[in-house]
């Protein structure tokens, strides 16, 4: 913890707190490397954005020179590993109460050393009020930006870059949040910003929008009238009162006016006929809770009706709501959603945003950074440094509520290359990567959260073992353990905190936390050793395959693919075997496989297809290093090449578990080419192309792939997609519909999942699909 700001006397009301203790490692991370700033100051909350460079360790591989050596008998590693420092770009967003603003500015001033700019972009109603204070403290010139332009730029940015950013609120569901998949075409839409008043904007493109309406009755009205009615001055306390109120004690309902005759009008008797109608005639005192609830309903219903009236003439069916009025409060989202559904008769969808509070700050930052072209990159949410969507529902326990109104964080990492859809997706807007939504499935959620928690000891042990020469590896590993454990506890209480909860998001969060504490590739030495062993076995495996008849060889190739997929250090059932039995190899893995018929078995259809004309080009998403890629995937690739099929072999851009990376695949392919003329000529003639996916995940999102890979798929006319492994073909993409033939194959290495699918440990999925005509 560090002192933030000079000590001073206590403050209250609108005065600024100058004596606040902040944890800078958690709040203002990488501030010393901040290059550019933006700030959005509202009536009660400040949102700060800054761009910084982050230095972290990465594991690099480089091929040895094996010229003139006998590679079959050469027991040296196939490549060397070095850990290097790499600098990447990161966006930081921090949200805090205006009470903290002077203390935070003092802290920033004391720690700001490398900024490249003399200007800070500012937006929001408080930009004018605090202009002099900001310029005095930071010695940066304040450039004020248009509020609406910033909001729209920010909204477009999060919808494009953050999967599961938008959600609908359904009060009777468990959980109430239903997240939307990223739509490749987000325009047009209606943005309703509820600040002090209401602004309604039609957004047509990234640069074109039109203000179409608004109202003076908005969040400020709720706050102001609420303060008069309840004597409660704080906005969140008003919402807390409303959540405990019963509006029908104050409002006149339809049944109060029409009695039983309301049914002939086609109206529900519970509809509000007159807000605060009973207060004019009832001779009684109304509770603060009931009045706050009635006021919230009145304003939310008005906003919902206005949104519908403006959406319909423009034929818009999606309305995004933002502004300080919402703040993720369930009672607010519930009333707005009900209003939209009622007045639109279900034709218009009310959508809320996980990061709606940051839109203005994000937009202001983008305005100031236009010369750096931030929109030409793709960005990804860093789960390790983000606090997530923390509901302020009064039903939550005090541990969860305590975070409301303090500091919330969002971090986004700039990715090396733009990410786009796989061109072969049948219907990109309806594509959902994940097979099971753990926010929906309570039993699966409980199992997987416990599974990842119980695996922590092994992950920590592996991380420490990967850096034997580091004096602080154990200390950093314990910090990783604590951070990831805390994330898991948050997700137990609030599974919606980072969007849709899935096995993929749990795996990705773990990878982010490992990277946070400089464990870039804990399995690098394991992969190096296993690649070396598998390369020495490759010639013998190929000779035995070539000796088989054609039909027998096809089955052997598929079994080789499946046996290779057994070697997954992310599966406890496998890692236990590999650690206890160092001699466990390719043949032993084959004997572990389920006998045919498999759990999902389309092999006969695949064999029949192979008797037809060859495919033009196959896109193969590989899984693990070592035996999997070398003895399973490459013989399969070789057979396709012999049939006259071009092959695009796609591997992870960065490390995750023991998955093969693009840089490792290049070295492996080079070594195999030295042993096999088929692979050698295919590489030379560019009939075999090795590309990176743009991902560093054990799973696969076909809507976020490297732009170069997508271009190559179009250029080569790929007509077969092969997806291998549990993470890529079962946890994700099992139901993915493609416009071409596909193979999804995996060995189920988790007993609980196998039983749930109707099988047993090491059951086989071999799913061959042909698109409908």
From Swiss-Prot:
EC numbers: 3.1.3.-
Binding site for acetyl-CoA: 196, 199
Positions where 3'-nitrotyrosine occurs in the chain: 320
Keywords: Acetylation, ATP-binding, Coenzyme A biosynthesis, Cytoplasm, Hydrolase, Manganese, Metal-binding, Nickel, Nitration, Nucleotide-binding, Phosphoprotein
Residues modified to Phosphoserine: 393, 404
Coiled-coil ranges (or none): none
Names of the cofactor(s): Mn(2+); Ni(2+)
Compartments, record wording: Cytoplasm
Top EC class for this record: hydrolase
InterPro entries: ARMT-1-like_metal-bd_sf (IPR036075), ARMT1-like_metal-bd (IPR002791), At2g17340_3_helix_bundle (IPR035073), ATPase_NBD (IPR043129), PanK_long (IPR015844), Type_II_PanK (IPR004567)
Region (Pantothenate kinase): 2-402
A Pfam family that the UniProt record links to this protein: ARMT1-like_dom
Record-listed N-acetylalanine modification sites: 2
Residues modified to Phosphothreonine: 406
Chemical reaction(s) catalysed: (R)-4'-phosphopantetheine + H2O = (R)-pantetheine + phosphate; (R)-4'-phosphopantetheine sulfonate + H2O = (R)-pantetheine sulfonate + phosphate; (R)-4'-phospho-S-sulfopantetheine + H2O = (R)-S-sulfopantetheine + phosphate
Subunit structure: Homodimer. Interacts with PKM.
Protein name, UniProt field: 4'-phosphopantetheine phosphatase
Encoding gene per record: PANK4
